[in-house]
């Protein structure tokens, strides 16, 4: 089984991924795939370089480029595990790539929704090199994500979790969701 975790930047996807990992489920991060490709091309890991490589990959390999690069990592993990989590799928093209590459696998989409103002504050506090520091940067990044088609992936989710509460409550919701998914599938 493949579990795709999607949501806007800063929504709380990594909390879900970590909860699956606590239960022994390995993961592949789509963002890490792009960062690895950026490093392979000899570029410094800046927001600009990662964005350029992301665009270049899609020009070279198509809109599902990152998924194509992630397929072998997922395949390798599925050889040793019944369940694999993919973090950060952004388009239905990418979902389709995984469905085509793994026709016998059940694929489940889990989406996280978090209000924009909460995501902005989290991203500012997180401090990753590519996180926005102004509301304008934040909105620009959101529009880029939406242009990739992330809203379509969220709309097709099998499970939706809302992260609009204190951290402890969200952690409880995540634990319940992960337990439910693993029990039902």
Swiss-Prot record:
List the InterPro entries.
NTP_hydrolase-rel (IPR022970), P-loop_NTPase (IPR027417)
Protein family membership: Belongs to the UPF0200 family.
> Superkingdom of this entry's organism?
Archaea
Task: Indicate whether Cell membrane appears among the record's keywords.
Answer: no
Q: By what name is this protein known?
A: UPF0200 protein TON_1344
Report the PANTHER family cross-referenced here. Answer: DEPHOSPHO-COA KINASE, UPF0200 PROTEIN MJ1399
Keywords associated with the record: ATP-binding, Nucleotide-binding
Q: Which terms does the record give in the GO molecular function aspect?
A: ATP binding
- Residues involved in ATP binding: 7-14
């Amino acid at each position: 089984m493949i579990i795709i975790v999607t949501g806007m930047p800063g929504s709380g996807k990594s909390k879900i991924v970590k909860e699956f990992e606590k239960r022994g489920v390995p993961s592949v991060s789509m963002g890490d795939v792009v960062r690895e490709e950026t490093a392979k091309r000899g570029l410094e890991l800046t927001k600009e370089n990662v964005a350029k490589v992301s665009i270049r990959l899609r020009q070279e390999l198509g809109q599902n480029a990152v998924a194509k690069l992630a397929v072998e990592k997922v395949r390798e993990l599925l050889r040793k595990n019944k369940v694999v989590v993919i973090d950060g799928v952004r388009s239905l093209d990418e979902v389709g790539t995984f469905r085509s590459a793994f026709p016998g696998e059940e694929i489940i989409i889990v989406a996280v929704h978090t209000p924009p103002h909460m995501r902005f504050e989290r991203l500012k506090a997180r401090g990753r090199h590519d996180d926005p520091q102004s509301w304008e940067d934040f909105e620009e990044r959101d529009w880029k994500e939406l242009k990739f088609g992330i809203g379509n992936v969220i709309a097709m989710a099998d499970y939706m979790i809302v992260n609009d509460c204190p951290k402890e409550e969200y952690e409880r919701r995540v634990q319940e969701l992960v337990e439910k998914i693993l029990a039902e599938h």
